[in-house]
Amino acid sequence: MADIMESSDGTILRLPRIALVVPSLAEGGGVPAVARFVKDVVVRSGRYQLKLISLATSSRDSDSRRFVDPASWMRKVGTSTGIWEGLPFVHVGTVGAELEFQRYRPHAALARVVADCDVLQVVCGTPAWANAVCGLGKPVAVQCATRARVERRMRDSDPRSAGAWWRRAMTAITDRIDDRALRSVNSIQVENLWMLDYAKCINKNRQVDLRYAPPGVNAVDFHPLPTRDLDVDPYILCVARLSDPRKNIGLLLEAYAQLPVQLIQTVRLVLAGSSAPPAAFWVHVNALGLCDRVTYLPRPDRATLIALYQQAAVFALPSDEEGLGVVLLEAMACGVPAVATRCGGPDGIIADGEDGYLVDLDDAANMALRIGLLLSSHDANRKMGAKARMTVMKRYEEGVAGIAFLDIWDHLLSTRQNHI
């Protein structure tokens, strides 16, 4: 990527540098997927340089000072390099990595890494991560999906061990850091409407650039087939980290089991993702006599994933909590109608009854009803799938969604220059 450009009067100008700051960039999941979108926005624009920065998320992080590793006490916080999406990134450790809240604190090593950057764009699940780069003399934008207290409510609801109580205490501390970060950054981009309302409430006494700015979808790669054959081996698809309790995959199994017998006999349930459902799920599958009807595909590559979407009869998202639901957008981009719970992100994406269906949390009966409607009427299925594709093209296609980010960075740069 070129780092200079020539102005109309022949002056050579340095392109401003955007630091894309992401917790554990090399890991999979929703956050790196959003980071990939933001990275592409920067690269396609030709208006900025890009610097990728990965933050420590593990208590065993080798670049960090660790309380349990006396040999690390006297050395500086380290950095290491890697390649992500064909581009170099810098991984930065922290001080006291065993304590979650320490990972959200600014420190000298991180300040040195961002010193040559003009805008710091943080992409994260919960906004606490932005606190790590606040106060370093650079404008900070944070793109976030949820709050730690909301994201972890199922995990922390019934602590029964010392470790569980410890994690619950870390959540309480992180919740306060979430709020501090939202009050400190210069720009906030959220992925769902409830988080938009919360960020407005937190910032009611100050002016901040606050927007609903979800990531976009590559609608060229994720596209519908000319025709979907709903008669030959139809299946319901769910894509998720299926071991995560928040994905509530058991709800989808309950809904599937409540479908009319003739549909169960002809329509399979296909699950795909980076982690398999827990053992208890498969015990339940066996108890329901559905072993030959439920399939799990581990870690499908991109081409396989797109084909899974394109050929699905219905996409189902049974989650208890979703900051956005990128998989939902990918399915809709492929012209597949979706049934999703009102779990946060989908509430702002789907117009219920128009381009998909929304059902209440833990409502297996209504999920089964909506899925059954889409399986029983091919005409309704195709019409809703076409509307789903239109929704993505109007609001979530990556070029459309990227405009908000470019505008935010331009505004932060102009504001910074006015204060220099």
Stretches found by the model and what they are:
Residues 282-303:
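Nucleotide-activated donor-binding/catalytic signature segment of Leloir-type glycosyltransferases, i.e.
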Residues 299-300, 307-312:
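Short alpha-helical donor nucleotide-sugar binding micro-motif in glycosyltransferases
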Residues 58-59, 239, 268-282:
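Glycosyltransferase donor-sugar binding loop
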